[in-house]
């Protein structure tokens, strides 16, 4: 066997030798013919792996191929080889090099056209097959009504509930789709939000429905810029929410400006409406956090108007029911959410600050591509966050490194190569173009864009963009900022009969001349500032010249005369308060209304005094603290703090961190010189010493007050319940008042509180006044003319006006009244058979300062004086007096929120 293999292998080797010798001889002849002299017929070849080889060294197959090509056997092979050589060449313009370089776009366009043409032909050829094959698959998704993304398949012209005819698709999102539809019952177009047919989306949409229904009940008159939910229903396993149809959103508006931004005036109108909406959301009955405030979620009501509404509460929650940690769109995400600190309603204020800058500049203020980039861009503008915030945040190490030596923090080194400016070096001053004519200098010399306007805007934005949510400006304070201060030539209120936009609406034919800081109050509301205030009063008969002269110059007592019924003669006797009133009084609704001169002791001795104290300091610091809360102040023995909730919403916000009881005792007696001392004190810091409270810039407009709670009885809170108010509640809780109260004045106080509350919210007007009434302070014997039982003719109000900010107005029976209030000199009224209180709307303009309550007219017994209470602030020479004792003095004054027209101005 082995021998056979050797024999065979030897035979193969012999054959190879024969071939090799034949190849060598033929090679030698070729070389001889060519005269190459190859030396013994050996042929040299190109180096193989670095050395020259002979033909013998090549494998047999290589030698055969080489021999075949080196000696063509026939002319046919030669011709075939020649045919393969090109005799013409391609034009360079049409060559592949040009097509794939210079003409690359044209090449790909051609490729796309060819591809989609083939795809279309293929789809047309197999359409019937596809329809039949997809039917089974589509039935897997809600019987064919849904696509594979669990969205409802929209068909134009389809009717939901045989009522809503689908018009078109408006938009899509992670939640589902929004379609425009026609409501055949109400004959109007609506927007229907169709939620995905998935359990998580359905659950969140049900929370949205609950929150929207709460807000719509609290905003029955549709004044607080929240989208109106008409109804909701289930349709083929999809929850459908029917909304009013609005226009395009603020991002679309920016895009229409080519991202150059809108004017500062229009930005102000947007800001005012949004602050009012946030103030509404912050009421204790709601405490709703939007959690996704951005330009896309703010829609214009009309494309030619500035009225807006907030939409998309799909991510929203209430303060005590936070369920998400990853919230807010990145550009508008607050530092506490980025850092992982517990958040509250203040995150919406941060978003609002970012939105306002973007609306004016046209570009996002902080446009991070991820959270780390976002934090770096925030630090570029605002500097480093406070150390105490970073110490308590559990995501600090994601953004910052801690220096061991001193415990301070520095930004982490960037891993992606981006370079950032040093902390705080990209100034908001430069971004807004405060001194350079606005962003990019585009607003240079444009009216309403002065350096002063920009400085106010910048100051407001910096307060909104405070790192610490506890010191970030609240909506209530923001609305009182100087940025919203109206000028005499710009009116943004709309008012009906009996009220004007720029002049104070008088109550009953009263008029007064007031200075720019004016404290003039019509009809029984003593001026707090005799140097500039003017008081006018009219009785049932025409006032005499002496009365007019007396009221034009006099003020009542120590300047805290609030309420009705004070006569000109009494005001003439009082000592004027020698302190100026630099800012307008907060909205006070003084219904007036006792039967004799003792009526000035009905409620609070120091309402006007507190108002002056609270508003006389133009606080510029960001941590201006609100007034003390009832939770702390009602324990003071001499302050009667437990009655604070008689006048909710008067002058400020409650502060859950304050301890006011330790300083209230010094204000127990406020008449005479003590009141001057009280007004003279101001607190410029952030301590709990609340005998003096500093406020931010106050706008010359009444801040919006909240609507009454829903009539379900939940609003009647006793004092212990009031102590449970949530922290950072933005709306003012009450105005503290001080002094002692007699048993007779208790009934009078209850009566006046009832009257004030009954005027608090009128359904025929959108002017919302905080109810507060006060007693005039003057020098005299506090024992004359005690309150007659007829003062109790003002019965306690019914529940609809009984509460505000979670504070009971409807009952004084639960309130401890430790000491009697000292009565000052009674106010003598001209004799007559009856007295009527006619009230106008509180408005802001160019007269004195005063207060009005909208709507009702009450008859009381005793001496007659038609008491008109008006409010106007400004620098004009006279306040407008309208109404003339009419029961509908301001029955149709639809002020939309605060200082925003019902029919807003045209966008420019």
Swiss-Prot record:
GO terms for cellular component: nucleus; terminal bouton. Gene3D superfamilies: Phosphorylase Kinase, domain 1, Transferase(Phosphotransferase) domain 1. The keyword Signal does not apply. It comes from Drosophila melanogaster. Changing residue 191 to T: In mnb1; reduced brain volume. In ventral nerve cord and supraesophageal ganglion of embryos. Is most prominent in the mushroom body neuropil and the outer proliferation center of the optic lobes in third instar larvae. It holds the Pfam family Pkinase. Residues 132-141 have a biased composition (Basic and acidic residues). ATP binds at residues 170-178, 193, 243-246. Disruption phenotype: Flies exhibit a specific and marked size reduction of the optic lobes and central brain hemispheres but no major alteration in neuronal architecture can be found. Residues 577-589 have a biased composition (Pro residues). Residues 567-576, 655-664, 868-893 have a biased composition (Low complexity). Role in the specific control of proper proliferation of optic lobe neuronal progeny. CDD domains: PKc_DYRK1 (cd14226). Residues 623-654 have a biased composition (Polar residues). The active site is at 292 (proton acceptor). It is an enzyme of class 2 (transferase). The gene is mnb. It comes from the Eukaryota. This is Serine/threonine-protein kinase minibrain.
